[in-house]
Amino acid sequence: YSINLWKFGDVASDDAVKGGNDGDQAEIGYIDDFTAQSDNGVIAEFWQNTYETISRANNVIDGIKNTPMDATKKEQMIAEAKFLRAYSYFQLVNIFGEVPLKLYPQNSDKNIYVGLSSVEGIYTQIEKDLTDAVVLPVSYAVTETGRATRGAAYGLLAKAQLYQKKYGEALTSIQNLESLNLYDLDSYENLFKLGNENSIETIFAICFLSNQVPTCSNALNQWLAPSIESGYFFDNPTQSWVDIFTEKQTDGSDDLRLDASIGRDGKAWLNDNTFSSSWSSTGYLVKKHNQPLSEVDAGRKGDGGLAYIYLRYADILLMKAECQNELHHPDLAEAPLNRVRNRAGLADISGKTESEMRSLIRTERRKELGFEFHRFFDLMRWGKEVATEALGPEFTWTEPRYYFPLPQTELDSNLGIK
């Protein structure tokens, strides 16, 4: 798994810019300013890695069908593969739009020169795979932490339905998830620390391990860290993101999510350091994906072991609030929204109109989920007016929404794409 989603979810959004040295990783800069062409290496790498995941999932789904083994274990393995296939297509459809929908093993005649499927068709397959995946176990032994669960299937299904504006169906999926009675909010400051990533709040996380051969580590620990810690200081938070934190906690202090998410000048950083604005192009760095040197020393900085939390319960609560509001029930959106706000130390919201509540929910998503690689996709699904206002003059909306170009390698080799 190559953890490149930040280059689209963060850098392409108004939450972050490329960062790093000016000449380093120039192709990420083209993602940042929407000038990426089909020969962009970032696009090619993401495409290749994601389709490799899909290929492996297809091999499992097809190959295990006639394998003599325990029926329950077989069902679980097929469901896990379908979940990972759905997760992969969910990323592809939201970055590229129409893509080849490959559902057979790589060596199958049906998998050669597969043309583009419609966005609607891809979402149909995503929903089918996730519906099949809800037979997954609700939990696993500690030694198998990181496997997809029933809650993960319901949660990703709800997200896919929300993205299609199927608000009622998304609420049903959320209700199914909540009926498992497994998830709750945890301490925000501790969510992104080693050992806490799979807390009661985590629904699906992609796990990594340090000190492994071959490597299975999280290199974000180096990509996003300051140079004084042997980091490359990419994914720099914008002033625009910092400026949304105007609302104080009920005790008058800053929203606790601000300093839990980023480093700011004069504030405590990792390793008993005080953050300096000189460490990045914007004056800020992402804190969420960094480990202290006591866990991963500077000499092996890229060998991080911190999990990437893709889906957590706070996201589900905000999705629930959004669905209720879009179904014209702003009053029913208050409870899930306030649970997230209260955890951050903020006061309750009540008595808002549908329009006011929509704005509040969108701002709350930006605060709560900052630098977890969701923002760009939220902007796209909220439409032209929201996206163009947030992304500024560098961004040009294209109907039905902006998609990044397919990689040239695929265009050259796949004769099914006309």
Predicted regions and their residues:
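Hydrophobic core segments within long, regular secondary-structure runs in both alpha-
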Residues: 51-54, 58-61, 78-79, 120-134, ...
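Conserved, well-structured interaction surfaces
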Residues: 22-96, 111-112, 116-121, 130-142, ...
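A glycine-rich, coil/turn loop motif that links secondary-structure elements
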Residues: 73-79, 141-152, 191, 350-353
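Long, intrinsically disordered, low-complexity segments
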Residues: 19-23, 40, 50-53, 125, ...
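Flexible, polar/acidic helix-loop-strand segments at domain edges
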Residues: 30-31, 35, 246-313
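An aromatic- and glycine-enriched ligand-binding surface/loop that stacks and positions planar moieties
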Residues: 1-28, 123, 127, 131-137, ...
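Active/binding-pocket-proximal capping segment
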Residues: 317-320, 327-346
